Design a protein with these regions (language model features):
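N-terminal basic/disordered segments at the start of proteins
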Residues: 1-6
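Non-transmembrane, aqueous-exposed alpha-helical and coiled segments at domain scale
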Residues: 242, 257-289, 295-343
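Short glycine-enriched loops at secondary-structure junctions
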Residues: 54, 294-295
Length: 389
């Protein structure tokens, strides 16, 4: 919030029990670590690495039901609630799934600790991965100079005998949308040192655009726990709403307590965001501003796939940086739906995923994600924005 770090948050739109495997978790962590290395070098700021994982098993839906042909069933609301299979028994909500969410989240966190503390996250290893990405990609030449700069810096430190422990392990935090209040309440504990309540289902939790009503249960719950809290703000958000959320969720104006995650859409970001940032800044509140360039840029293709275009995602991030640069405020971070696998869910990017390509590896349980290559390409482009901020 004070401009002394950059926030990188990424992971699945909706986690599934089936995808909670060591390989899948490792690939997501690897992608986030690769992105963070590039962003950190070019921003000269610490990068706070946050996964949308170990709890992101529930999703709000615009429609309560889904119809296929003549059959209408309850909508899939994430593995925490029901199953994606289109049958009556699978779509029937089952509260026993929440126990499985807890157990799967615990197992995921154990794997995260192993990967981030056991040498897998060594900065030199991450740099070698990035070099491999550049060498194998169709657009590698564009980023080769940037990678070479990082390589020279690492080589200089190695030649000087510098081998800090910080190179070998990283702090990695877990986050999810606090959607199912009963689950979050069941995992709220009183800290023995401070006697304050914390939701121990995750380090960071956020409230979605659909559930951020001031008099709603989600805002009321978030106001009572001491975790850092995020709130999604869409294109219809007003300054008064933002200020009211600050009063409710952070009445003491504690820096870093509240994050506003903007999801405006590329067409709206430059028109809507300035008034929000300016109004909040003038109020004296110190919030962290993070760009979610995914949710405001979703559309359906002619062949029936929900998708996003890489250029729209990039343009929203670019607009986010432009607004903050003009106002003299800190573009605090990005919030990305991504996977470490080579899926084909979002269009464009250096590998030019086409509408026809969507058919080959469209694997998401909910919304489309950037694949490994698109995620890394975005990090190099955001790194350029950070350097010029």
């Amino acid at each position: 919030a004070a401009g002394r770090a950059f926030w990188l948050q990424g992971g699945d739109c909706a986690e599934t029990f089936a995808a909670a495997t060591a390989d899948s978790i490792r690939n997501r962590i690897k992608t986030i670590l690769q992105m963070a290395a590039v962003l950190q070098y070019y921003s000269s700021l610490p990068v706070i690495k946050v996964g949308r994982m170990a709890g992101q098993f529930a999703k709000p839906r615009s429609n309560d039901t889904e119809t296929r042909g003549d059959i209408t069933l309850p909508a899939y609301r994430g593995d925490a609630v029901n199953d994606i299979e289109f049958t009556e028994s699978a779509r029937t909500p089952d509260p026993n799934r929440l126990v499985r969410v807890y157990n799967t989240s615990a197992a995921t966190l154990n794997l995260v600790r192993a990967f981030t503390q056991g040498g897998f996250a060594d900065l030199r290893r991450v740099h070698e991965w990035n070099k491999g990405f550049i060498r194998d990609s169709q657009f590698g030449e564009k980023y080769e100079q940037m990678a070479n700069e990082i390589g020279r810096a690492l080589a200089f430190m190695e030649s000087a005998g510098v081998d800090p422990e910080q190179f070998k392990a990283v702090d990695f935090f877990a986050s999810h949308e606090a959607l199912i209040i009963e689950y979050e309440k069941a995992l709220t504990r009183i800290d023995s040192r401070t006697q304050l309540p914390y939701d121990v289902s995750g380090h960071f939790i956020w409230i979605g655009e659909r559930t951020r009503q001031l008099d709603g249960a989600h805002v009321d719950f978030a106001a009572k726990v001491r975790n850092p809290i995020g709130v999604k703000l869409g294109p219809k958000s007003t300054v008064n709403e933002a200020l009211a959320l600050i009063d409710k969720l952070n009445p003491d104006r504690e820096p870093g307590r509240l994050t506003f995650i903007t999801r405006m859409g590329a067409k709206n970001i430059r028109e809507v965001l300035p008034a929000l940032v300016d109004g909040v800044t003038k109020s004296g509140a110190e919030v962290l501003w993070v760009s979610d360039p995914m949710h405001g840029n979703t559309f359906e293709t002619k062949n029936g796939y929900k998708t996003r275009h890489f250029e729209d995602v990039l343009d929203e991030v670019r607009g986010f940086f432009e607004v903050h640069k003009k106002l003299g405020t800190h573009p605090g971070g990005i919030h990305i739906e991504l996977t470490g696998d080579d899926v084909t869910e979002c269009l464009g990017g250096g590998n030019q995923v086409s509408e026809k390509d969507l058919e080959s590896r469209y694997e998401t349980a909910c919304d489309p994600r950037l694949n490994h290559s698109q995620s890394l390409e975005l990090s190099f482009l955001v790194a350029e924005m950070l350097r010029d901020r």
